[in-house]
Amino acid sequence: MEVLREKYIKEVVPAMMRKFGYKNPMAVPKIEKIVVNIGVSEAVQNPGAIEAAARDLAIITGQKPIVRKARKSIANFHLRKGMPIGLKVTLRGERMYAFLYKLINLALPRVRDFSGVSPNSFDGRGNYSLGLKEQLVFPEIEYDKIDRIRGMDITIVTTAKTDEEAKELLALLGMPFKK
């Protein structure tokens, strides 16, 4: 999907230079990486849940996820240090743009009662996070092939210095923010 990268170069960079007064096109903020995370809490009782979630995440992102292990034991959660409890994928380059295109144009419109993503989910340093309640919004996932519905956290890391710059960058790329 060269679509978003071309849009960034041809439309976003000139618009950002006009709005924020950048002298150099290289100073314009860009998307650095996208991190997709799934917490698999049921992996404590059901070790096969990690494989199922990993398969779904690999299909969605096109990249094999890293298994995240518990850093410390927590007795109330029946959790031991070193147990697999989550999955993470860091997307950069072409896969990152392909995933972002798919998220904006295919997945988010399929979310039930979707009216736009929250404009308040910036972290103060120009990064944006959003959560999805189910992996079924991605067209590659078939309802019959999944063992259970899982949510995921998506963090878009940008080189923007402020939230205002990052919001403008994502809005110009097509992210549907609530009005």
UniProtKB/Swiss-Prot annotation:
<protein>
    <recommendedName>
        <fullName>Large ribosomal subunit protein uL5</fullName>
    </recommendedName>
</protein>
<keyword id="KW-0687">Ribonucleoprotein</keyword>
<comment type="subunit">
    <text>Part of the 50S ribosomal subunit; part of the 5S rRNA/L5/L18/L25 subcomplex. Contacts the 5S rRNA and the P site tRNA. Forms a bridge to the 30S subunit in the 70S ribosome.</text>
</comment>
<dbReference type="GO" id="GO:0003723">
    <property type="term" value="F:RNA binding"/>
</dbReference>
<dbReference type="Pfam" id="PF00673">
    <property type="entry name" value="Ribosomal_L5_C"/>
</dbReference>
<dbReference type="GO" id="GO:0000049">
    <property type="term" value="F:tRNA binding"/>
</dbReference>
<dbReference type="GO" id="GO:0022625">
    <property type="term" value="C:cytosolic large ribosomal subunit"/>
</dbReference>
<dbReference type="GO" id="GO:0006412">
    <property type="term" value="P:translation"/>
</dbReference>
<keyword id="KW-0820">tRNA-binding</keyword>
<dbReference type="GO" id="GO:0003735">
    <property type="term" value="F:structural constituent of ribosome"/>
</dbReference>
<dbReference type="Pfam" id="PF00281">
    <property type="entry name" value="Ribosomal_L5"/>
</dbReference>
<dbReference type="InterPro" id="IPR022803">
    <property type="entry name" value="Ribosomal_uL5_dom_sf"/>
</dbReference>
<dbReference type="InterPro" id="IPR031309">
    <property type="entry name" value="Ribosomal_uL5_C"/>
</dbReference>
<comment type="function">
    <text>This is one of the proteins that bind and probably mediate the attachment of the 5S RNA into the large ribosomal subunit, where it forms part of the central protuberance. In the 70S ribosome it contacts protein S13 of the 30S subunit (bridge B1b), connecting the 2 subunits; this bridge is implicated in subunit movement. Contacts the P site tRNA; the 5S rRNA and some of its associated proteins might help stabilize positioning of ribosome-bound tRNAs.</text>
</comment>
<dbReference type="InterPro" id="IPR020930">
    <property type="entry name" value="Ribosomal_uL5_bac-type"/>
</dbReference>
<keyword id="KW-0694">RNA-binding</keyword>
<dbReference type="InterPro" id="IPR002132">
    <property type="entry name" value="Ribosomal_uL5"/>
</dbReference>
<dbReference type="GO" id="GO:0019843">
    <property type="term" value="F:rRNA binding"/>
</dbReference>
<keyword id="KW-0689">Ribosomal protein</keyword>
<keyword id="KW-0699">rRNA-binding</keyword>
<comment type="similarity">
    <text>Belongs to the universal ribosomal protein uL5 family.</text>
</comment>
<dbReference type="InterPro" id="IPR031310">
    <property type="entry name" value="Ribosomal_uL5_N"/>
</dbReference>
